[in-house]
Amino acid sequence: MSATSRRAVLAPPRTRKGGAQVAPPGPPVTATPRLFLQLVRDRLGLLTSATAAYGDAVRLTIGPKSIYLFNHPDHAKHVLADNSAAYHKGIGLAEAKRVIGDGLLTSEGEVWRAQRRTVQPMFQNKRIAHQDAVIAGEAARLVERLRARVGGPPVDLAGEMTRLALGVLGRTLLGADLDRFHSIGHAFEDMQDQAMFEMVSLSMVPLWLPLPGHLRFRRARRDLYRVADRLVAGHPDGGDDVVTRLLASPAGVDPRPARRRMREDLVTLLLAGHETTASTLSWAFHLLDRHPEVRERLRAEAVEVLGDRPPVYDDLHRLRYTAMVIEEVMRLYPPVWALTRVAQRDDEVGGYHVPAGADVMISPYTLHRHPAYWTDPERFDPERFDPDRAHGRPRYAYIPFGAGPRFCVGNHLGMMEATFVLAMVSRELRLAHVPGRPVVPEAMLSLRVRGGLPMTVHRA
């Protein structure tokens, strides 16, 4: 039986007066135990199977929650952009607030707008263009570390990408060397683990209980707050960086005490500013090893454009194939795999009624695999992003950086960093998987590689 016919048999949508469908189709309430188990063990599998079985609009009832999963470019445009005022941050927000506080990722309304205005100037193209030497320098240090491991035991590439991304973040935005804070990467892993535990347990387990995960979380939060305190305490006056802007910004509509505000805003920036780039680069090197023809073409472009010099900002438009590779990596493994919202008032999406208070989800992971917009969607094919082939594709079929007012503020910086790193590493080195070691995606706050990514280093 086809997915289309299953939709018709299993869950025909109800209609209300006037013909609008009341609720999308979806699994029956009796499927709640199975869905909950999938939510805990295989979140990506849950979303993929739901859209395959029921189509572009699915209602998932999991315990007391009903999640409205929409999987069409028009749906994404409506929820995230055109009618974004009717939707606030959604599923997992309360849990994320308990873990990382009220920073830019979790705030709403006037508080969020004030926070965005504070940091946005740091991400303008003209400022980013002047950071090219800093980013190339961090990439060169990565190449040097990897070069020292040629022919040696495997290196945890995911860990190296985290170290690199934190190094770039520290020098470009914070005016600090974050390499001296060795615990940051592990602390964020513990924070993510706790955030997902909070979400799937519906925050029903008190944080004060001395469970191993709670103890790791409290230690991680303490370590990150210490990092934030040291960044503020050792910060020089008059710098051109985020710390300076945060220190100078008035509290305004933000009700948090000053010290808590600085801590939470810096921890949020540390998390958001490194996690997505580190994840994208990890998946990029994984896919390049699986597709040597792509790796060799990328290397040839790097050699032709750069020779043996470091890249500069003006090279970005010349490293076009490298950018296409990164775009395809983010199609298959979008760093943010789910964008969640809560409807603030009754709405209609794709002909379906969405009641006020409903949990709504747009998943870039499933949207980027929609067969109507992506031929052979599981295949790694950077040529999809050749301008000639991309022409006519709906804009909202591809949203690796989100969409609408909450579009990722650091997208240009992240793309420059990823482009420089792929070009500089691939020009000189080849990274290979450890035989027999599976590479499995893990849907946490970002889409990371479960258990790290051990790879051996070889000369190109």
Feature map (PLM): residue ranges:
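Cytochrome P450 proximal C-terminal region
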Residues: M1-R14, G19-V22, T48-A52, A139-L142, ...
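Cytochrome P450 catalytic domain signature, combining two hallmark sequence patches
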Residues: K77-A96, T375
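N-terminal targeting/anchor module and adjacent flexible "hinge" preceding the catalytic domain
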Residues: M1-I67, D74, G92-R98, R230
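Cytochrome P450 heme-thiolate monooxygenase catalytic core
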Residues: S2-P24, H88-A94, S107, V111-R113, ...
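Cytochrome P450 I-helix active-site segment
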Residues: P24-T30, D132-A136, H186-D190, G239-T244, ...
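Conserved cytochrome P450 K-helix E-x-x-R motif and the immediately C-terminal K′/meander segment
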Residues: L35-G55, R226, R230, R309-G350
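Cytochrome P450 catalytic-core helices
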Residues: T276-R295, R299-E301, H412-L429
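Conserved cytochrome P450 K-helix/beta-meander segment immediately N-terminal to the heme-binding cysteine loop
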Residues: A85, I362-A390
